[in-house]
Swiss-Prot record:
Listed InterPro entries: Ribosome_recyc_fac, Ribosome_recyc_fac_dom, RRF_sf
Organism per entry: Chromobacterium violaceum (strain ATCC 12472 / DSM 30191 / JCM 1249 / CCUG 213 / NBRC 12614 / NCIMB 9131 / NCTC 9757 / MK)
Protein name as it appears in the record: Ribosome-recycling factor
UniProt xrefs under CDD domains: RRF (cd00520)
GO biological process: cytoplasmic translational termination
Length: 185
């Protein structure tokens, strides 16, 4: 019973960590990386799909992403989708490939992005702590129903706390890495 609660809590915490990682990927740094376009949606025969499902997305150099559509008619649609996204990018069509140069981030914009990233990290930490609270409540209910002993409850809460500490530390580590990326000129 304790292991089931622990396993459930760990799965939920892992999902929270994955969601935080995806949120971090949406925040662009000064450097180009192909993942930045993963959330840009393109109209493909009536349905919205991510850019990486209708084109090859590659790095041309450290500050430029190349997007090569698999179908020529998609070129203009992809270019428009990138331009209309909230990423602040200005793609340029070069024959069969779209070049997406990454603009330099201003100091003010970097600080704003760091605030956003810290907010996302705090949201992830709160989610992990809520999972801990829910698990501890389950242990208390089991104790009240006399399904487990007080020692089992204490042991379960300690294990959940260790998981909470582990995932919170992982969130902090990811935050520090992203902040360093944002501050790098």
């Amino acid at each position: 019973m304790i292991n089931e609660i622990k396993k459930s809590a760990e799965q939920k915490m892992q999902k929270t960590l994955e969601a935080f990682k995806n949120d971090l990927a949406k925040v662009r740094t000064g450097r180009a990386h192909t993942g930045i376009l993963d959330h840009v949606m393109v109209d493909y025969y009536g349905s919205d799909v991510p850019v990486n499902q209708v084109a090859n997305v590659t790095l041309i150099d450290a500050r430029t992403i190349g997007v090569q559509p698999w179908e020529k008619p998609m070129l203009a649609k992809i270019e428009k989708a990138i331009r209309d996204s909230d990423l602040g990018l200005n793609p340029a069509s070069m024959g069969e490939i779209i070049r997406v140069p990454m603009p330099m981030l201003t100091e003010e914009r970097r600080k704003d992005l760091i605030k956003v990233v810290r907010g996302e990290a705090e949201g992830a930490r709160v989610a992990v702590r809520n999972i801990r609270r829910d698990s501890n409540t389950e242990f208390k209910n089991l104790l009240k129903d006399k399904a487990i002993t007080e020692d089992d409850e204490r042991r379960g809460q300690d294990e959940i706390q260790k998981l909470t500490d582990k995932y919170t530390a992982e969130i902090d580590k990811m935050l520090a890495t992203k902040e360093a990326d944002l501050l790098a000129v």
